[in-house]
Each structure stands twice: as C-alpha cells, then as structure tokens.
From Swiss-Prot:
Keywords associated with the record: Cell inner membrane, Cell membrane, Membrane, Transmembrane, Transmembrane helix, Transport
PANTHER family, sorted: MULTIDRUG RESISTANCE PROTEIN MDTC (PTHR32063:SF34), PTHR32063
InterPro entries: AcrB_DN_DC_subdom (IPR027463), Acrflvin-R (IPR001036), Multidrug-R_MdtC (IPR023931)
Name of the protein in its database record: Multidrug resistance protein MdtC
Superkingdom: Bacteria
Membrane topology: Multi-pass membrane protein
GO MF, one example: xenobiotic transmembrane transporter activity
Chief location category: membrane
Family per record: Belongs to the resistance-nodulation-cell division (RND) (TC 2.A.6) family. MdtC subfamily.
Gene Ontology cellular-component terms listed: plasma membrane
Subcellular location(s) of the protein: Cell inner membrane
Pfam families membership: ACR_tran
Membrane-spanning intervals of the chain: 15-35, 333-353, 360-380, 387-407, 431-451, 463-483, 528-548, 853-873, 897-917, 953-973, 984-1004
Length: 1024
C-alpha cells in the first residue's frame, strides 16, 4: 500500500487527478442521451404485400406461403409469423439479438426478389419491407382535423406531405396514416343498367384503363426547333371520366355516366378515424430499432412548426399523444431520488463522526465517484435511463463505503492522539487490502451478468457496468483523495461536540456495549447461532420457490392501448358505431386526458385505440386501476369487446396481439387447430388468474360460397376466369387505372354501387357477355349459399397458428398465471398434433426462470473464487458468504410484505445484496485474521475484537447503503413501480442481515476456523 502514500504527500497531483475525473464526467453527462430503459430492441422486419379483393385464404396460399418459403432461408431468423386478411399479408421476421438489422434487410430484399416469380401477377405493387417492430407502442400520435376538408383530402396531405417529411427524421422507423385512405375516382356501377345496355363489367374496366394512359409520345424537330408532343391521354377527375364512351347501342353512344355513378372519393370508403369526439386522420409514429425515444421526439417536435406551415390554414395539425412526457417525469423522479440518497448518506457520516471536517471528506468523494461514472457511460454508448440512474442511486451507498472504511480507521487513530498525516499513512495501510477486497468482490458479483447473452444480458449490462465503474472510481478515490483530505482536514483535538451529538455518541456506545454482551452469549452458545444460520438458509430456499414471480414490474407509463374486436360478420357502418361508443365510454373516465382511434381497411371487424391518461399528480388511480374500472363498463356493450392494456417501456417479441401476454398454438393440421383452439380459449377464460382472454383465430366470418356448374359453363361459352373477373370487378374494389399527379399517384376504383353490394340478391343481377355476345346471368351456371370463412389466416414457421392473448388481473403474477395455464392445458388432454407454448414476454419469462437461479449461483461462485484468491483460503470465503441467507430472507419477506412479485428488478437487488452484506463479513474476517496472525490471538478472541472494532464502520456502511436505497423503496412518483422492487429488496435484505449477521458471522468463523485446521489436503498456510 506504499504506492497510495504518494497521493497523501502530493496533494496538488491528487486534486488535479480528481478534477480530471470530474471534468470528464461533466462532459460525458452533457453528451449522454436520455431513454426510459437500456436499449433492448429486437431486430424486426415486416414484409407487406397486397392484392385488393383477395380473400384471406387466397392471400395466405398465394402470397404468404411463397414469401415465407423464401424468407425462412435467411440466417438468424428466430421467429417468422404471418397474418393474411382481406387483400393484405404481413410477414413479421424476428431476428437474433446479434443480427445486424441493415444486413438482415438486404437479405430480406433478396428473398423478396427470389419469390417474385411465384406471386400473383395481379398485385398492384411489389412486396415491401419496413424495419420496425409492429408490437411497439407509438412514440407519438398526430392528428389532422378540418371543418372544410374531407377525410380523403386530409389523408392525402398526411400521406403525401407530412408522412414523407416525418419518415426522413432520424430515429423515425415508421409513420402509419389511418382514419381514411387516398383520394380516388370511384366508379360505382349499376348492374341493371349494364344489362339493359348489353355492356359487361370487363368492357367498362377495359375502356377506363385504355382512356387513361401515360406513355411518351416523342418529339418532332426541324433544322431550327424541336417540339415535344403532348396529348390529352390522361384523365384526372370524375368529371373527365363520366363522358367516356363505353359502347354503341343502335348507333347511340353508351357513356360511363349512363351505367355508373362516378365520383371523386377515396380508395377505400371503409375507414374511419377519431380524435376524442371529432373525425380525424391519424399519423401514428414508431421509432426505428436502436433509436432514442427522447431525441426522436424532440426532432419531431422541432419539425412541427414547419409542417404546419405547409398546410392550409383550415387544417389543424396537433400532437395528440407524446410518450416522452412520462419518460422525462420518471427520470426526473430518479434524479431526485439520487440527490436525496447522496444527502442521506452524508448525514449518516456526519451523525457517526460528529465532525463537519470529517463529513466533508465523503461529501466530496461520493459526488466525484458518481460524476466520473458519466464519462465511462458515454464511452460505452449508454444512456441516462431508469436503470442506469437507479444504479447510480444505489451506488451512493457503495461508493461511500470505501471512503467510510478509510475515514473511520484514520479517525480512530486521530482520536487516539496520532497526528493526522501519520494516521492517514497508517490507516490506509491497515484497511487498503480490506477496501480492495470489498470492491473487487462486489464487482465480481456482476461478472456473470456481463457474460450473459440474450435479453437478460442486454438488459443488465448497462446497470452492471455503470455500478461497477462507480465502484472502481470510488476505490481509487478512497485510496488517494480520501486519505489525503484526512491528513489535512482532521484535527487531533477536535472541539467539544454539541450535547445532542454527544448524546448520539453515547447511544452508539451503549448499543456497542450491548452488542458485545450479546455476542459473548452467542459465542458461548454457538450451536444456536449455527442453527439460526441453517434455518435462514432453508427459509431463503423456501421463499424463493414460493414467492410469485413476474418478468418486469407492471409500469404506469400514462398510456393505454385498446384493441376492439367485434362480431366477425359485422358491417363497417356498425363497426364505426362501436368505435364511437367505446371512445365515448373511455373519454368519460376522469383519469383519461385524450383518446384517438381508427377502424377499417383490411381488418373489417377490429379497431385500435390509443389513450393518454392525465399526469400521475392529477389522478388518484394507477393505470391498472383505470383499466379495471373501465373493464366493468366496456363489457356491457353487445357484439364487440374492447381490451385495454397499459403500455410498457419494454415488450418482448414482435407479435401484434390484443393483450400483454400470448400463448401460441401450432399445428400442421388446420382442422385440428380450429377444433382445439376454442376449447383451450374457453378453458383459459374460466381461469381466475387471467382476464381479457381472446384469440386471433377468426374463422366465423360470413361467406357466400358459389358453386359453378362447369358443364353449363362450357355449353354457354363461359370459363372460370371470366366469372372470377366478373366478381372481382363487381365486389373487389378493383384498382383499374392510375392517375399520375406531381406529388402522388391515385387510383381509379371500380365496383358495383353500394346499393347492390349490401344484399346477397345482388348476385342475381350479375351478367356475363359470352363469346357470342349474349348476356348470361350468373344464376344460369352457379349456385350460392351462406357459409363461414376466416377473416384472417395466421402462420408461424410455415405451420398453421393461432395466438391466445391474455392480461393479468390485479394481484396476480405471471408465474401464477403460467402455472394455471399449464394445469389447464394438461387437464384438457390436447393431442400431440396441436403444440402449445408461450410467446413474447411470457416466453422470455419462462426462459429466465431457470437462468435466474443459475445467475445467482454463478454470482456467488464468482465471489467465492475472487475471495479465495485474495485470502489464499478455501474456508474464509465461506465465512464471508454465510451472510447471504439472512439477506435473502429479508429481501424476499419484504417483497411478500409489500405484495411485490419477484421480477428482474428484484433479481438485481438480490445480486446487489450479495455484494453489500458480505462487506460486513469482510471487515470482520480481515481484522480477525490480522489479529490471529500478528498478535497470536485465538480465533474467538480475534473475531470478538474484530466485531467490536468494526462495529461502527459496519453500522455506518449498512446505514449508508440502506438510506441510499430508501428513496427508491418509498418513491411514489412517475416510474416508482419500476424502482420500488429494487429499493424494497435492498432495504429488507439489509435490515434482516444487519440483525443476524453481526452474530452469525462470528459463529460461522469459529466453525470454519476449526474446519480449516482438520483436513490434511488443505494448503500448509491454512493449517498454520
């Protein structure tokens, strides 16, 4: 330890070293990004393809399957799911954590190109892909409203001008425009008029397509000039299409306006969007993988004034919801907790040392250690988030420990009359090894975390490194700056203390004397002490097995997501009414600030809602209580359900579902899947551990099944392709031509007038023109009858799939729900052809259950190895580790007392306790070993003296760690539900370990000392 004496003799160099650490930390702090949690984004790519008018089964077989076969060959794909609905297919690719998203995107594009020849020729566009996770909650929602512009015009502004600009902002991954569709010229045909005029639907389609053509015409030039040829070959508005001549009948022209209603409308009239009670077009913005939410939101807000300037004055552009508000509030709460922790820790030092000069030393050491950590965080690419700031908050109790141990030992020599400089040199030499042992063994706790991969490794890495760096800086400061300041600030003859402080000192001395008497009794009855140790070990195991467990604490981010699912045969008009009803119910709740929603498109019986709650200070209930209150009202609406879930800062997987957790069913037999899925879903619905049970299997949609008489068709001169074209032209909202404009392209959409498509009798009015020019009614060769058909077809890994989603009621943990599901599935006797498993967050939770125990054991083993190396002993590390069971009992009992399930955050607390409570034993064992080796004391005399000498620093360090974590445990502001399990675990573990280990550790030391003297296979040094 002579090296550290240089810093005591060279104060200028020491201060400059400290200043360098502080300046680097301030610079790093200013450059650090802000985020809710460490970056744990999964690489996800969504491939989208469309074929207007195609049924879900056709989309699944002709579009999804060829794409899946090509995409499934890409390396690093961990999960591939697809969903095919009316005219639309989405294939979601979830990649391994270490897969580069840009490289994966190149492979995806190559697979799409390879599958192109296998896709239907009638697709209006090639399949496209987006690098965005569709299950992520949006970071911002904007609304466009107007009293003068139609929804189609608003949608045009949103998709043409706003979405393009927003998508260019760094960090924006996807901008979805909802609530309407692009403007289009709609041709609504009258089947009866067509029959009377002898005109086929395909003739109308062909006429329109040929009348709107955009092709180059070339140029004419002479010796002087060149003239470009321009014709009126394009039609842009409904007024230009109406006079088109379709046919001549008896010498008279039959125009389009004679057989159809031609209007300037939208591509898909079955779309609706609402913002609170007002029709609106929505811009739903999601971030790209690895993007920072706060930075992205700030960039978007910076663009809003310019975006508003591009719009007409009568169009309002508003930010309806912003996810950064609660994130900023939560981080502000953590920063407050950090400041309070620092203040409490300094007060502990002042209360024990009763000297302002002495208190100033750790008051400098703690901020320097914390501030210096920011530099390392920046160099590692970390962010200021809840976990990293929680690490710094907890670190206040750790970083002060080293300073306290050094300061207390030097103060003891100064109080004994030694000069401060000599006391500093002797004090740091005596406890230098102890401080190094405590710090290295504490950092060793996190080594297994740093070596882990997957979600836990990625999630814990930032916390572990932040805490480890702060401890490392604290170690350097405690052995350099702290003894140097002690040598210059402490005084041998301090003035008399105030009576109140002398009173505190007398109380502490009385407690220490009482502890000495109690320790005498315990050492005289060592077997009872050993029995207590064994009992705490058994109780720890029992509590760990029995305590409810979950993945992460349920957060209140101030945002809810709602998913509407109505009867599968519901009309769009009725579905829009359900949306308005549900939005009104939600909007009337006193905790709700705003609500936006939309329905329509390919999802004919579903809709989505995004709800912003009032700030936590303005409402009395948390998000789960609001959901429970609304659930009672929402269940009264017949024919539809609205499922709500609280938005979480971390959600695992890429599945879009109507609830927070998923259970997937796979089968190679679609019939088996459709037979067993309803049975399993009903069984889950009966479980009290689950609520909002629903499924994505929708196979009860209304279908009109047509059966062709092929013999009659051959006799009448009609083939199947002609009939399919007829039906597609009539009912498929077929896009038959493209209108080119400077900023966008629009479609001409053809179909029968809605009056003729709202009743099955419309099929009786369908006619074909055969090869002989005769009108043949559809009924002459086809029969039809109602049937059921799927509204969507789901695949996972080329197997038929169905996902059952569920939420948890208040007071039920994920482990309890998982166990109930497993029991239910077992009791049903589901055949082997139907395979069930958890997916998303629930799947990762199942995987982490076994790894948690191994992680704790690995941390203990690592600490044992490090301590064994430091002490050159097999036995003494066991003495130090004997403090852990009591801490485990305290932590788990505290979680039970506060009704908090064991989560990943609580696991962090357990790992921290492994590092904290062993410090007490290290201080005892280190001094006891010195006394035995240097003064020839017996083991009992040595451990008794060490316990009394180290009583004050043990109490100080424990109180410092406890009070450092107390603001986390007692916090009640934004994000408190994420911080509380960590604080509760640490406080509970410290209280219990402090009460027990002061007595059990000396007992274990005596038994271990006897043990190390017996075996002959131990090293010679151990037996001496």
């Amino acid at each position: 330890m002579r090296f550290f004496s240089l810093f005591i003799h060279r104060p200028v160099a020491t201060w400059l070293l400290t200043l360098t650490i502080v300046l680097a930390g301030f610079l790093g702090f200013r450059l650090l990004p802000v985020a809710p949690l460490p970056q744990v984004d999964f690489p996800v790519i969504v491939v989208t393809a469309s074929l207007p008018g195609a049924s879900p089964e056709i989309m699944a077989s002709s579009v999804a399957t060829p794409l899946e076969r090509a995409l499934g060959r890409i390396a690093g794909v961990s999960e591939m799911t697809s969903s095919s609905s009316l005219g639309s297919t989405h294939v979601i690719l979830l990649f391994d954590f270490d897969r580069d998203i840009n490289g994966a995107a190149r492979d995806v594009q190559g697979a799409i190109n390879a599958a192109q020849s296998l896709l239907p020729s009638g697709m209006p566009n090639r399949p496209s892909y987006r690098k965005v996770n569709p299950s992520d909650a949006p970071i911002m929602i904007m609304t466009l409203t107007s009293d003068t512009y139609s929804p189609g015009q608003l949608y045009d502004y949103a998709s043409t001008k706003l979405a393009q600009r927003l998508a260019q902002i760094d960090g924006v991954g996807d901008v979805t425009v909802g609530g309407s569709s692009l403007p289009a010229v709609r041709v609504d045909l009258n089947p009866q008029a067509l029959f009377n005029q002898g005109v086929s639907l395909d003739a109308v389609r062909s006429t329109i397509a040929n009348a709107n053509v955009r092709k180059p015409q070339g140029a004419i030039e002479d010796s002087q000039l060149r003239w470009w040829i321009k014709t009126n070959d394009e039609l842009h508005t409904a007024a230009e299409y109406r006079p088109l001549v379709i046919h001549y009948r008896n010498g008279a022209a039959v125009r389009l306006q004679d057989v159809a209603t031609v209007t300037d409308s939208v591509q898909d009239v079955r779309n609706a969007g609402m913002s609170n009670a007002r029709p609106a077009v929505l811009l739903v913005i999601r971030k790209s993988p690895q993007a920072n939410i706060i930075d992205t939101v700030d960039r978007i807000r910076g663009e809003v004034p310019e975006l508003r300037n591009t719009l007409p004055a009568s169009i309002g552009l508003d930010i309806a919801q912003d996810s950064s508000r609660t994130i900023r509030a939560s981080l502000h709460e953590v920063e407050q907790s950090l400041a309070i922790s620092v203040g409490l820790v300094v007060l502990v030092v002042f209360a024990f040392l009763r000297s302002g000069r002495a208190t100033l030393i750790p008051a400098v050491a703690v901020p320097v250690s914390l501030i210096g950590t920011f530099a390392a965080m920046y160099l590692c690419g970390f962010s200021l988030n809840n976990l990293s700031l929680m690490a710094l908050t907890v670190a206040t109790g750790f970083v002060v420990d080293d300073a306290i141990v050094v300061l207390e030992n030097i103060s003891r020599h100064v109080e004994a009359g030694m000069k401060p400089l000599l006391a500093a040199l002797k004090g740091v030499r005596e406890v230098g090894f102890t401080v190094i042992s405590m710090s290295i063994s504490l950092v060793a706790v996190f080594l297994p975390l740093l070596l882990m991969d997957g979600i836990i490794g990625r999630f814990f890495k930032e916390f572990a490194i932040t805490l480890s760096v702060s401890i490392a800086i604290s170690l350097v400061i405690s052995l350099t700056l702290t003894p140097m300041m002690c040598a210059r600030l402490l005084r041998p003859n301090a003035p008399r203390q105030q009576p109140r402080l002398r009173g505190f000192g007398r109380i502490l001395m009385a407690i220490q004397r009482g502890y000495g008497r109690g320790l005498h009794w315990v050492l005289d009855h060592a077997r009872w002490g050993l029995l207590v140790f064994v009992a705490t070990l058994g109780l720890t195991v029992y509590l760990y097995i029995s305590i409810p467990k979950t993945f992460m604490p349920e957060q209140d981010t101030g945002r809810l997501m709602g998913f509407i699912q109505a009867d599968q045969s519901i009309s769009f008009q009725a579905m829009r009414g359900k949306l308005e009803t549900f939005m009104r119910i939600v909007r009337d709740d006193p905790a709700v600030e705003s609500v936006v929603g939309f329905t329509g498109g390919s999802d004919t019986n579903s809709g989505s809602m995004f709800i912003a709650l009032k700030p936590l200070s303005a409402r009395s209930d948390n998000a789960q209580q609001v959901i429970s209150r609304l659930r009672e009202k929402l269940t009264k609406e017949p024919g539809a359900n609205l499922w709500l879930m609280a938005v979480q800062d971390i959600r695992i997987g890429a599945r879009q579902s109507n609830a927070g957790y998923q259970y997937s069913l796979l089968s190679d037999s679609l019939d088996d899947l459709r037979q067993w899925e309803p049975k399993i879903r009903r069984a889950f619905s009966a479980l009290p551990e689950l609520v909002d049970v629903n499924s994505d299997q929708q196979d009860k949609g209304a279908e009109m099944a047509l059966t062709y008489d092929r013999t009659s068709m051959a006799r009448l001169g009609i083939d199947v392709a002609d009939v399919n074209d007829l039906l597609n032209n009539a009912f498929g909202q077929r896009q038959i031509s493209t209108i080119y404009q400077p900023l966008n392209q629009y479609k001409v959409v053809m179909g029968v007038d809605p009056r003729y498509s709202q009743d099955i009798s419309a099929l009786n009015q369908m006619y074909l023109i055969n090869k002989e020019g005769r009108s043949i009614p559809l009924s002459a060769f086809a029969k039809w009858q109602p049937a059921n058909a799927p509204l969507s077809v789901e695949h996972e890994g080329l197997s038929a799939a169905s996902t059952i989603s569920f939420n948890l009621p208040e007071g039920v943990s994920l482990s309890q729900a998982s166990a109930a599901i497993e029991r239910s599935v077992t009791s049903l006797g589901v055949p082997a052809s139907v395979r069930g498993s958890f997916s998303g967050t629930a799947a990762v939770f199942e995987q982490t259950q076994s790894s948690q125990l191994w992680l704790i054991l690995a941390a203990i083993a690592t600490v044992y190895i490090v301590l064994g190396i430091l002490y050159e002993s097999y036995v003494h590390p066991l003495t130090i580790l004997s403090t852990l069971p009591s801490a485990g009992v305290g932590a788990l009992l505290a979680l039970e007392l506060f009704n908090a399930p064991f989560s990943l955050i609580a696991l962090i607390g357990i790992l921290l306790l492994i590092g904290i409570v062993k410090k007490n034993a290290i201080m005892m064992v280190d001094f006891a070993l010195q006394a035995q080796r240097q003064e020839g004391m017996t083991a009992r005399e040595a451990i008794f003296q060490a316990s009394l000498l180290r009583f004050r620093p043990i109490i100080m360090t424990t109180l410092a760690a406890l009070l450092g974590a107390l603001p986390l445990a007692l916090g009640s502001g934004d994000g408190a539900e994420l911080r509380q399990p960590l604080g509760i675990t640490i406080v509970g573990g410290l209280v219990m370990s402090q009460l027990l280990t002061l007595f059990t550790t000396p007992v274990v030391y005596l038994y271990m000392d006897k043990l190390r003297r017996r075996p002959r296979w131990l090293p010679v040094e151990e037996k001496s």
